[in-house]
Design a protein with these regions (language model features):
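N-terminal amphipathic/basic-hydrophobic helices that include classical n-h-c signal peptides
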Residues: 1-20
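Conserved positions in beta-strands of structured domains
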Residues: 35, 127-130
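A conserved acidic, glycine/proline-rich C-terminal tail/linker
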Residues: 202-228
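Enriched for short, Lys/Arg-rich terminal
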Residues: 240-253
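Arg/Lys-rich, positively charged N-terminal/basic patches that mediate binding to nucleic acids
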Residues: 4, 8, 23-67, 73-75, ...
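Active-site-adjacent substructure of cysteine-protease-like catalytic cores
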Residues: 69-123, 211, 217-221
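Short solvent-exposed strand/turn elements
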Residues: 132-158, 250-253
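Short coil-to-beta-strand transition motifs
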Residues: 25-30, 117-126, 231
Length: 253
């Protein structure tokens, strides 16, 4: 039987070991990489499942590209993807961050946010598993940059992972969406590229831009143009007001 005194003694020993400068370190090896509709960080939804039309796949590396590694996934609708924020790795630790949800000006502790600047650069996202085949997992509702290294995959377990009693005063509900409108020629361009790509491009653009991707501290004017690449197309838009975006152009990147 494990006694509390044993736990306290062990904790003291660990503190003593760390205070002496001996800290455990380890390396991780990706099990695969994400192939995503998002080619740059800007305009990626700040949480998973906010843009159901955002699709991609996880390309698994050997030995995890074999059928044995995915056996049973056919009975699972959603998975947790554990990944590396490979574009925001830093040598200097950040103790406080400025989350967009608080306007980009207020700081909170790094452990109270899901900011990409993490102590070990590790992130996790719950995404929908569309289908699985040896070497590839097709997923949607993603918030993952193309080329993201995947460290692990775990099944989403509804009774354990959905906590009805949980609360978060900082982000207790999904952000308010803003209106997305189209110039006629831009909508026609998007329809043509959607047909060529065989992807829900119009829905992707609307769902991502409705999240208001601009930095929270910016006060855009109608003259200022924004742009981002989805798949192989460049999308350009402007803010008619702080609550309305107008898509101007959708063209090959």
């Amino acid at each position: 039987m494990l006694r509390l005194s044993d736990i306290y003694s062990a904790a003291s020993a660990v503190r003593g070991k760390y205070s002496g400068g001996t800290i455990m370190s380890y390396t991780v090896t990706p099990i695969g990489y994400v192939r995503s509709c998002f080619k740059e960080k800007f305009a990626i939804p700040r949480q998973p499942l906010l843009a159901p039309a955002a699709q991609g796949c996880i390309e698994l590396l050997p030995p995890y590209d074999q059928a044995d590694a995915i056996a049973g996934l056919e009975d699972i609708s959603h998975i947790w993807v554990i990944f590396l924020f490979h574009k925001t790795l830093e040598d200097t630790p950040r103790l406080k961050v400025r989350p967009p949800r608080l306007g980009g000006n207020k700081s909170i502790g790094v452990f109270a946010s899901r900011a990409t600047h993490r102590p070990n650069g590790i992130g996790q996202s719950a995404v929908r598993l569309e289908r699985a085949e040896p070497g590839r997992l097709w997923i949607s509702g993603i918030d993952l940059l193309d080329g993201t290294p995947v460290l692990d995959i775990k099944p989403y377990v509804p009774y354990a992972d959905s906590l009805s009693m949980a609360h978060n005063a900082i982000a207790d509900s999904a952000p308010t969406l803003i209106t997305v409108s189209w110039q006629p020629n831009a909508l026609q361009q998007a329809e043509q590229h959607a047909q060529r790509l065989q992807q829900p491009l119009i829905e992707l653009i609307e769902q991502c831009l409705a999240q208001d991707p601009r930095p929270a501290y910016q006060q855009p004017t109608p003259e200022r143009m924004y742009g981002v690449q989805f798949y192989d197309v460049q999308v350009r838009w402007r803010y008619l007001t702080l609550e309305q975006i107008e898509v101007i152009e959708v063209c090959l990147a």
